[in-house]
């Protein structure tokens, strides 16, 4: 009998009932909620005269709509947008009513859901984790079964602690070798998406493995798993190892004492068996990956920084040719234009993909002693949580950014999506460390280019895309 993949093990350990129609009922260990997808779910509970089944499994924080400027210091009443103000207030009210742990807007522990969950130790190896947000795959970096759910499913999990789901196929993405200097986890995942496309992972749970993945920090692994959904996969994961255990140890929600010892023992099995069979295997050579930049309106439209924008006339597939033509028109680019010739208007360093302390350190390392280019209208740095902000300030990173001409903000989702005051104007090009570059994602008519934090900082100080390795020396 063939061995099991990590995904198989996680699925089997949470399976409550297999149903005749091919779907299954799975148990949920951790439910993370925010202000956008939870209000309707709580209202549904009230209408059905139900209460949350397991209060201690839920943590909450507002993130999508919260302002990242000093406006927030005036409290919820100071939020200018009426809908945003109502959603943040409703989350507070619902959590207060049911006794749910919430890190409110001005709590120093508040932040982006996919940053604070791991930061607090609320995400643990072997758990099943859901949230009403597609980037919940981030938590798979801990050897957890994690994926986003819709609002109706948020209500279902609140009421029953279970979820109806169908088992996915197994994909292994193996990245072997040593990454070149200046190449990061963000570049790996963009390269993966460029290789398999945004539909490549449809119907799969992706396990990321190989020496290059093992060499990444836990924060780097979170970046990789975060963008699994951009590759078409709801689930992305990395097997548990000593780095995972060391990261979790001592965090507020982590087990303590004898329970910790038992947990660590159980976590040793959270790896794919040596003889496990994957339905699909994708291989990348880490040494061949260069700093990546997305040029179009889909994450799969990505190239190395030293390449040129594609020429649709050279694409034989009529559907792909049409997609390239539409993307070029929306992005205001020309066929064969060098990536390094793209002029930028704004720079955003933040989001659940790249707002952790290592991301900020990498960006600050590039920004130190330099100035934001005069052609850049705005460059903002948004920490993923209040604790990360405090740590960065302790290290003096805020001063590095401010001295260089960046704006240093309060935590939140910010310019990743146009649901708060941070957004692009029509026609503006932005170097962004976020995860999506769809039309209008950062504001109506806005043009998003996905990059790593170091590449974003390099773009800010030069006004265009440049290989960050030209500005840094190997240690």
UniProtKB/Swiss-Prot annotation:
CDD domains: IPMI
This protein's pathway: Amino-acid biosynthesis; L-leucine biosynthesis; L-leucine from 3-methyl-2-oxobutanoate: step 2/4
Enzyme Commission code: 4.2.1.33
Co-factor binding details: Binds 1 [4Fe-4S] cluster per subunit.
Domain of life: Bacteria
Amino acids binding [4Fe-4S] cluster: 352, 413, 416
Annotated GO MF terms: 3-isopropylmalate dehydratase activity; 4 iron, 4 sulfur cluster binding; metal ion binding
InterPro entries: 3-IsopropMal_deHydase_lsu, Acnase/IPM_dHydase_lsu_aba_1/3, Acoase/IPM_deHydtase_lsu_aba, Aconitase_4Fe-4S_BS, Aconitase_4Fe-4S_dom, IPM_dehydratase_rel_enz, IPMI_cat
Reactions mediated catalytically: (2R,3S)-3-isopropylmalate = (2S)-2-isopropylmalate
Pfam family, one: Aconitase
GO biological process: L-leucine biosynthetic process
Top-rank EC class of the record's enzyme: lyase
Listed SUPFAM superfamilies: Aconitase iron-sulfur domain (SSF53732)
Description of how the protein assembles with itself and partners: Heterodimer of LeuC and LeuD.
Protein task: Catalyzes the isomerization between 2-isopropylmalate and 3-isopropylmalate, via the formation of 2-isopropylmaleate.
Protein family (similarity comment): Belongs to the aconitase/IPM isomerase family. LeuC type 1 subfamily.
PANTHER family given in the database record: 3-ISOPROPYLMALATE DEHYDRATASE, HOMOACONITASE, MITOCHONDRIAL-RELATED
Name of the protein in question: 3-isopropylmalate dehydratase large subunit
Biological source species: Pseudomonas syringae pv. tomato (strain ATCC BAA-871 / DC3000)
Gene field: leuC
């Amino acid at each position: 009998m063939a061995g099991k993949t990590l995904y198989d093990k996680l699925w089997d350990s949470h399976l409550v009932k297999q149903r005749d129609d091919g779907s299954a009922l799975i148990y949920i260990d951790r439910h993370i909620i925010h202000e956008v997808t939870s209000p309707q779910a709580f209202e549904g509970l009230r209408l059905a005269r139900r209460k949350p089944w397991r209060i201690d499994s839920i943590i909450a924080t507002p993130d999508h709509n919260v302002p990242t400027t000093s406006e927030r210091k005036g409290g919820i009443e100071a939020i200018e947008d009426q809908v945003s103000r109502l959603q943040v207030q409703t989350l507070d009210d619902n959590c207060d009513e049911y006794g749910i742990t919430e890190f409110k807007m001005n709590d120093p522990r508040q932040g982006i859901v996919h940053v604070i969950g791991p930061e607090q130790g609320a995400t643990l190896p072997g758990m099943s984790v859901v949230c009403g947000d597609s980037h919940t795959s981030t938590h798979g970096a801990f050897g957890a079964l994690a994926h986003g759910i819709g609002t109706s499913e948020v209500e279902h999990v609140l009421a029953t602690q279970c979820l109806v789901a169908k088992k996915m196929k197994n994909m292994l993405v193996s990245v072997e070798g040593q990454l070149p200097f200046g190449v990061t986890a963000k570049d790996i995942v963009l390269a993966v998406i460029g290789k398999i496309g945004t539909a490549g992972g449809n119907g799969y749970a992706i396990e990321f493995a190989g020496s290059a993945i093992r060499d990444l920090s836990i924060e780097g692994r979170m970046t990789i798993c975060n963008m699994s959904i951009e590759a078409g996969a709801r689930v992305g994961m990395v097997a548990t190892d000593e780095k995972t255990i060391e990261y979790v140890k001592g965090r507020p929600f982590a087990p303590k004492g004898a329970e910790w010892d038992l947990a660590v023992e159980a976590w040793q099995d959270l790896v794919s068996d040596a003889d496990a069979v994957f339905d699909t295997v994708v291989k990348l050579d880490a040494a061949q990956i260069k700093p990546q930049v997305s040029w179009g309106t889909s994450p799969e439209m990505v190239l190395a920084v030293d390449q040129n924008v594609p020429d649709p006339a050279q694409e034989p597939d009529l559907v792909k040719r049409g997609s390239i033509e539409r993307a070029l028109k929306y992005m205001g680019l020309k066929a064969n234009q060098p990536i390094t010739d793209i002029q930028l208007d704004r720079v955003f360093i933040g989001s659940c993909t790249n707002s952790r302390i290592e991301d900020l350190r990498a960006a600050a390392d590039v920004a130190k002693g330099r100035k934001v280019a005069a052609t850049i209208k705005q460059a903002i740095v948004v920490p993923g949580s209040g604790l990360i902000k405090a740590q960065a300030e302790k290290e003096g990173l805020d001063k590095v950014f401010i001295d260089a001409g960046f704006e240093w903000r309060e935590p939140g989702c910010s310019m990743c999506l146009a649901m708060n005051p941070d957004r692009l104007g029509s026609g503006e090009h932005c170097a962004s460390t976020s995860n999506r570059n769809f039309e209008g994602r950062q504001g109506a008519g806005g043009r998003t280019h996905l990059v790593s934090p170091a590449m974003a900082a390099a773009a800010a100080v030069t006004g265009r895309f440049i290989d960050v390795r030209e500005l840094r020396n190997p240690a």
